[in-house]
Amino acid sequence: MSDMTLLEAVNLALHHEMERDPDVVVLGEDVGVNGGVFRATVGLRDKFGFKRVIDTPLAEGLIAGVAVGMATQGLKPVAEFQFQGFIFPGMEQIICQAARMRNRTRGRITCPIVYRSPYGAGIHSPEHHSESVEALFAHIPGLRVVIPSSPKRAYGLLLSAIRDPDPVMFFEPDRIYRSMKSDVVDDGIGLPLDVCFTLRPGRDLTVVAWGACIQEVMRAANLLAEQDIQCEVLDLATIKPLDMESILASVRKTGRLLVVHEACGSFGVGAEIVARVTEEALTSLKAPPKRLTGVDAAVPYYRNEEYYLITEQDIADAAHQLMENQWL
């Protein structure tokens, strides 16, 4: 057991799977000699060689497409994009090739690919380096979308993503890459890619979040507990497929739902969760569900970034509004 950052946990998972399975390869810009833009792949090339840790040109479409070719020929590529906002040139390959290969070939050919990238605001970077567009990929049939919120989750979820027979979008919240540490056991045990995790039980309010927002949610839950408001906190972890069973069970217990995410609110994952809860558990609700999201705008430059990010006080205020708001 080691105390490590989320970034170190990602690196550990990559090491583990490359040792376990010789078909696992890593590719991307600067992933080899330099160990990646955030050093997530540091040490891999020295240990596994240039044939399994491949530096690519600055061409995201190429990275996405080469990964498809590798996967269809029996390899298990882990392709890194330096930031989520850089994935867009590779969208055609991801959506039209990787996501549809199993269906197109009636299951004869699959694409066991992990597309990794950091995502989110909070590191004083402009918009291409601060995107939160997980909803775009969650809309695509054939893709899994996974977002860890802690080092332990990052390790276990990445192991399972690499072992999955279909393409997985694995988005890592760069805001907490190095800002937190927790114990991680290199036991090779993956976490399921179809369940959310209950981080805190509660009776009054269900709060669903993922990624870096979990840190603010947990702090807000502690603050609210001092005011005798007990929040049940669910870490979604896997955006697609949604673990609606766990969400619905929690909402039926608490009667209230707050969804918190950094991405803009319109047509987002929060809207999908609220719609599903309203369809399937309307009579259990004591108040209308609420979303607390980013604004419908590009992430601002760093001087105004603090006004864009959701704080624990924002979450606490939203929780109070839910507790005070009742159906007419």
Language model features with spans:
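Thiamine diphosphate
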Residues: 1-167, 171, 176, 307, ...
